[in-house]
Amino acid sequence: AEENKGNFVTRLEDGTYKRIVAAPKPQKIVELETIRTLVDAGQVVIAAGGGGIPVMEQGIDLHGASAIIEKDLTCGLLAEELNADTLLILTSVEKVSLNLDKADEEFLGGISVE
């Protein structure tokens, strides 16, 4: 059914199905100046998280893209554009991992900038 709509579906190892969508590298933050104004005014801003819909510019209009926001790259871009001293990523998982939900998933106990 989803394939007939132009969507891609894959079967996971546990037998369930998942719709596959693109997660393109973010190019820019659309509301950057609004966010900058709030930060400069001393407000706590929560932005660039999951659940948002990426958009594409078409002329002077913005149109939703059939994709997901790659939130780690997006918040990194936002921090860079704001010249942030600190980037704090909050998550509900016990540990960050590589290869999430795959047989070779590896949990990271700690990471450094080196």
Role assignments for model-derived ranges:
Residues 1-8, 12-44, 48-114:
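Active-site phosphate/oxyanion-binding loops
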